[in-house]
Amino acid sequence: MPTISIRGNEMPASPIRKLAPLADAAKQRGVHVFHLNIGQPDLPTPQAAIDAIRNIDRKVLEYSPSAGYRSYREKLVGYYAKFNINLTADDIIITSGGSEAVLFSFLSCLNPGDEIIVPEPAYANYMAFAISAGAKIRTIATTIEEGFSLPKVEKFEELINERTKAILICNPNNPTGYLCTRREMNQIRDLVKKYDLFLFSDEVYREFIYTGSPYISACHLEGIENNVVLIDSVSKRYSECGIRIGALITKNKEIRDAVMKFCQARLSPPLIGQIAAEASLDAPEEYSRETYDEYVERRKCLIDGLNRIPGVYSPIPMGAFYTVAKLPVDDSDKFCAWCLSDFEYEGQTVFMAPASGFYTTPGSGINEVRIAYVLKKEDLTRALFVLQKALEVYPGRTE
């Protein structure tokens, strides 16, 4: 029998989804599972998007242009202008989610064997997309004790060699919630200029910054306009994960031309998703404000609750809607699986993402989990109580 590819064998399992069969089995036993594992917002999608889908009166659901509808891209120009990101519609290519934007960025800019420097912990799918492109992720460590702040520039330079082609950041960060400072962004700019690198910047969570600190986009950095590829998605800011609409943005026409070849090969981004996403830009300001305020309250509920549990520590995330917390356990993969397969408290349990899957360095994150605060506060409070009960009886507790 033929064997599967080396690439298929190397592709990592998602730390976010790999325990889903255990969660499904728990539900079949009648256990209520609090889903803290995945960044699936529970807040309503803008009514304008729902109405736009309901009111579709097309006779044919045709292919859209490979770059996405121009009307949508032109409206996005106005959206980004609110963040002092000055674009034209031609700078924007609509993709099937932010994931496709990352993949097409890698495929268009990197050769097999090229290296990307990424602070870790990092969004696990970056590793999968790098494998798909034949590229190699080189990670630079950040630590929970230092709030996951970026290391000194010298640490980046230690990793740069003749194969280094790019730096990838997620700002605000998934999974940690860390927000890069202006100084850190300027240091990254200087590295990109000095070594003539690409800068891939995943800025999906720009709407969710809780500290009052300024949002510094890679597109704000002077002198590297042609090096920057910005990754975006509507999934989080509009609770539209299922419509699979993202964007790849760059001033570099050579990159855009290369990306368009991959876009043409996959034909078109989702038609109905674009209709919903374009309509979402007409959502009232109250929608964004109420969404933001809700996440502020959930963040406080979660972080305060975590840090009250004996042996648990979480820094305060500055953005996005995740945190990485340290638990008093021997192995978070085992603990998260045990919570689903062997534990329940009053018919309830918790589903978290083991943080080891967000690292490439062996042994890193072994006692950490990523938690998404995408449940209402009452459910978060109950989930924290159930987590505390689980930690009290877990056989591999270390404290």
Name the predicted role of every residue range.
Residues 59:
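Basic nucleic-acid-binding alpha-helical/helix-turn surface characteristic of O6-alkylguanine DNA
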